[in-house]
């Protein structure tokens, strides 16, 4: 039985700016929900608003979790949470709190590290800091600039990190189809190891992604195009993608994420677990999800490395919860 559900606000401070085509973060608020059971057990869940991605706001999440519907809950299961008429991020925080009550084993998986959008002058030091920290796979955030500058960035990463360093390119929906085709062809000529191109076009443009996949060799990853099993059907039918990035907040919790991953893997997609930078508890939950579903994959779980304060450990390209 649930004794109380407490909603708290916290601020996450980053040690350096996190810059993508969608977000520019130095610090940001997160919402933490604490479920206390009559037995004395406590579960903690976290979420963050991402208006540019999920379409929610911080205040909407607070309203959800402080609502009479949620505050009046006395018994709840992961299946029950799916039926709550609240935002996916709000559901995810509640789902995460239930997971927290029963799971504290340490897990470890391989992860990449993000290289944010920056000027070329700063890029060298940014890459060097990540190499010195032991990371071996790099996710390069980009917007639609010039192809020449994109190639310069790739060359610089290879120069600092090694010629055959695996690089993932993530435009976060910022590219046009024409630019994506032209840029990918030049990248293929460069000899760089481009592991995949993540969500280059807008999330609704599955036909464009299919056309792109037929024009280039570099595999595509779906991220913003797939939040749930309903959208997965379109992803699979498009035959455009080889990879799928799954995030707990997008899916609405660990329980629905597990279901989505099973369906995606059955359809032949390779899974990578990511996060919305929703706080340390959220990253621990994502590490658990990654270890349970794709233990040998290189995931996208560097978020806690950006935090000024964190007890999550990173070493030699691994993240330890």
Q: Which residue ranges define each predicted feature?
A:
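Catalytic core of soluble alpha/beta enzymes
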Residues: 145-284, 288-290, 307-318
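Conserved beta-strand termini and adjacent loop/short-helix elements that scaffold enzyme active sites
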Residues: 8-10, 114, 223, 274, ...
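Short helix/strand-capping turn motifs
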Residues: 294-299, 303-304
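Active-site donor-binding loop signature of nucleotide-sugar glycosyltransferases
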Residues: 47, 199, 301-303
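Residues at the N-termini of beta-strands
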Residues: 4, 137, 196, 243, ...
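N-terminal capping/lid subdomain adjacent to the active-site entrance of alpha/beta enzymes
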Residues: 1-167, 172-174, 178-181, 185-188, ...
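Active-site lining segments that contact anionic ligands and/or coordinate catalytic metals
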Residues: 30, 241, 268, 296-298
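A general lysine-centric signal
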Residues: 139-141, 247-250, 300
């Amino acid at each position: 039985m649930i004794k109380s559900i407490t909603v708290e606000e916290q601020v996450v401070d980053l040690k350096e700016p996190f810059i993508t085509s969608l977000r520019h973060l130095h610090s940001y608020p997160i919402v933490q929900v604490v479920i206390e059971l009559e037995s004395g057990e406590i579960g903690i869940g976290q979420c963050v608003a991402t208006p540019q991605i999920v379409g929610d706001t911080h205040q909407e999440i607070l309203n959800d979790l402080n609502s009479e519907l949620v505050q009046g809950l006395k018994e709840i299961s992961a299946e029950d949470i799916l039926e709550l008429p609240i935002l996916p991020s709000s559901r995810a925080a509640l789902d995460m709190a239930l997971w927290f009550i029963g799971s504290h084993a340490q897990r470890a998986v391989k992860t990449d590290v993000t290289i944010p959008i920056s000027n070329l002058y700063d890029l060298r030091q940014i890459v060097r800091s990540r190499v010195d920290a032991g990371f071996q796979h790099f996710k390069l955030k980009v917007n639609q600039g010039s192809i020449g500058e994109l190639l310069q960035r790739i060359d610089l990463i290879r120069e600092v990190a090694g010629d055959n360093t695996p690089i993932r390119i993530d435009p976060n929906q910022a590219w046009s189809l024409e630019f994506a085709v032209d840029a990918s062809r030049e990248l293929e000529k460069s000899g760089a190891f481009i592991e995949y191109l993540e969500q280059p076009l807008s999330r609704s443009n599955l036909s464009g992604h299919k056309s792109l996949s037929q024009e280039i060799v570099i595999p595509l990853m779906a991220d913003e195009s797939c939040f749930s099993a309903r959208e997965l059907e379109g992803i699979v039918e498009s035959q455009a993608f080889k990879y799928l990035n799954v995030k707990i907040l997008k899916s609405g919790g660990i329980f629905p994420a597990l279901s989505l991953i099973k369906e995606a893997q059955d359809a032949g997609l390779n899974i990578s677990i990511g996060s919305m930078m929703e706080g340390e508890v959220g990253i621990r939950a994502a590490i658990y999800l990654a270890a349970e579903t794709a233990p040998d994959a290189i995931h996208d779980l560097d978020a806690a490395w950006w935090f000024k304060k964190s007890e999550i450990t990173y070493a030699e390209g691994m993240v330890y919860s």
